[in-house]
């Protein structure tokens, strides 16, 4: 999965968008991906790199836990503006660059993750309505300032 994503990035002239660091921080909140010992992960900078021509989310993570367990995470780090975060996630999901990459990656689970302030009002639109409209799972993660959420938590069995 990771090598096919890198090939696609090179094909569309976006290979410089790959980040060597699996952590992203903005507005005093953060996200990271800690792969398992045999897992492989890749972070792509979306904002002003993979996508420049429209609203977009901050970054994109791909995580291959095993041959059959492949995950994609669209991530937007936001303060209180929950609805704008969802607009950015939706716009990114529908952008041709993202569609091309996710097509070659073939994740078994695709997540949209909005990291927001713990004080953000997240009742509209409702999570289920957004998921139905966008055909992707949505996780809204309210964080305190200076907290970092590990995306690998979403891959663990409940």
Name each region found by the language model.
Residues 2-3, 7, 108-158:
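Domain-level recognition of nuclease-like catalytic cores that cleave nucleotide substrates
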Residues 25-66:
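Active-site metal-binding core of divalent-cation-utilizing nuclease and nuclease-like domains
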Residues 56, 69-71, 109:
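A structure-centric signal for secondary-structure junctions around beta-strands
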Residues 59-61, 71-79:
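Conserved catalytic cores of phosphodiester-cleaving nucleases, focusing on short active-site segments
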Residues 85-102, 110-112:
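Short, charged, amphipathic alpha-helix that recurs within catalytic cores of restriction-modification
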């Amino acid at each position: 999965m990771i090598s096919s994503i890198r090939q696609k990035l090179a094909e569309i002239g976006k290979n410089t968008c790959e980040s060597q660091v699996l952590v992203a921080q903005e507005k005093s909140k953060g996200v990271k991906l800690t792969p398992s010992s045999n897992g492989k992960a890749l972070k792509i900078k979306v904002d002003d790199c993979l996508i420049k021509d429209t609203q977009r989310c901050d970054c994109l993570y791909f995580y291959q836990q095993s041959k059959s367990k492949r995950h994609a995470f669209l991530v937007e780090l936001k303060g209180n503006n929950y609805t704008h975060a969802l607009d950015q996630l939706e716009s990114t999901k529908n952008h041709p660059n993202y569609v091309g990459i996710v097509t070659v990656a073939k994740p078994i689970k695709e997540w949209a993750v909005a990291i927001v302030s713990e004080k953000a009002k997240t009742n509209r639109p409702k999570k289920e309505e957004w998921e139905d409209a966008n055909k992707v799972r949505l996780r809204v993660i309210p964080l305190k300032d200076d907290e970092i959420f590990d995306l690998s938590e979403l891959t663990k069995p409940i």
